[in-house]
Design a protein with these regions (language model features):
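Conserved, well-folded catalytic cores of nucleic-acid-processing
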Residues: 31, 43, 118, 134-137, ...
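Catalytic NTP-binding/metal-coordinating core of nucleotidyl cyclase/transferase enzymes
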Residues: 15, 21-25, 29, 46-129, ...
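Short amphipathic alpha-helical segments
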Residues: 37, 41, 83-87, 188, ...
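Intrinsically disordered, glycine/charged-rich C-terminal tails and inter-domain linkers
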Residues: 155, 197-307
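Histidine- and acidic-residue-rich, metal-dependent catalytic cores
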Residues: 134, 159, 272
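Regulatory cytosolic signal-relay segments
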Residues: 1-53, 298, 302
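Catalytic/regulatory signature loops of cyclic-dinucleotide turnover enzymes
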Residues: 161-162, 170, 183-204
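Catalytic core of nucleotidyl cyclases, primarily class III adenylyl/guanylyl cyclases
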Residues: 92, 96-126, 140-183, 208-213, ...
Length: 307
């Protein structure tokens, strides 16, 4: 009886210890990308300073004019918006197999190809599919935030590059960061910096991997520190359907207007309703134009040609 009692006590202590470790590991998981957490706690990866050379597709994004966009908001409001934005974007990245590297202020860094990969081509395609889905979701969030009283929408720039990088644990034995470094990472950041708000700019190395799923236009070549070649960026102008035809996505957000149209997502039964809504909106704008003219707005032929 005494032995059974001791065994029962030991089992309870063991269960309590396991529960404690499970809670701790669950908390730690929020500080790591899911793929990194899984590889460490499954024993597939050691927690040592070690890097590998791999071909990755790297994604950078930031919010254009974030400071001026949020200057009228309180810090608590900015925190809520950013956390919701990062939560939504991170979920999309995870669904497409991306590893969320880090958050830098309002910027987001993601890479494809480590620790899990489907091959260079599929990794690049997954990254572009992720980026376009992020654009769609951000358009929905901007509508939601505007209705909640946020005057200025988030206008996001995105840059994507594919190339060889060093990826793994960097830092010291006391504090490590699992990340990717190299000139190709810097190029992705540079492409993001030249993108117009609402657009995705990709390198030629990425373009050749995804040109069957996106329509893109070449921009003037640029030079990037650390890369001994001129780089030709491409701006993504839309996605392609199975027949290779470009599908345009329309998005515009400003005071008095929240407009987003993805023809692929429209149900056939809703097409006529959408057409009627657009016709009514145009008629309302034309009526507003007449009101402005009657109120003294100058006609085009009366305007100063120097303006």
């Amino acid at each position: 009886a005494e032995l059974n009692r001791r065994l029962a006590d030991m089992n309870r202590e063991l269960e309590a210890s396991n529960d404690f470790l499970a809670r701790i590991s669950s908390k730690i998981s929020h500080y790591l990308a899911p793929q990194i957490y899984k590889s460490i706690f499954s024993g597939q990866r050691d927690v040592t300073i070690h890097t590998e050379r791999k071909e990755l597709t790297i994604f950078f994004s930031d919010i254009k004019d974030f400071t001026s966009t949020t200057e009228h908001l309180q810090p608590e409001e900015i925190t809520l918006l950013l956390n919701e934005y990062f939560t939504e974007m991170s979920a999309i990245a995870h669904n497409h197999g991306g590893t969320v590297d880090k958050f830098i202020g309002d910027a987001l860094v993601i890479f494809f190809g480590d620790p899990e990969t489907k091959g260079t081509v599929e990794d690049a395609r997954a990254c572009l599919n992720m980026a376009t889905e992020m654009q769609r979701r951000l358009a929905e969030l901007n509508v939601k935030w505007r209705r909640a009283g946020t005057e200025q929408p988030f206008r996001v720039r995105m840059g994507v590059n594919t190339g060889f990088c060093n990826v793994g644990n960097f830092g010291s034995m006391h504090r490590m960061d699992y990340t990717a470094i190299g000139a190709e990472v810097n190029l992705a950041a540079r492409l993001q910096s030249i993108a117009e708000p609402g657009h995705i700019v990709i390198s030629y190395d990425t373009y050749v991997l995804v040109r069957d799923i996106v329509a893109a236009r070449a921009l003037p070549e640029i030079s990037v520190k650390g890369i001994g070649r001129m780089v030709v960026p491409y701006v993504v102008e839309g996605v392609l359907d199975e027949a290779g035809r470009k599908i345009e996505i329309f998005s515009e957000h400003m005071t008095g207007l929240d407009f987003y149209l993805d023809p692929r997502a429209v149900d056939a039964t809703a097409i006529e309703r959408i057409r009627a809504t657009l016709r009514n909106a145009i008629a309302a704008l034309e009526g507003r134009g007449g009101e402005d003219a009657s109120a003294g707005t100058a006609r085009p032929d009366q305007m100063d040609p120097g303006l």
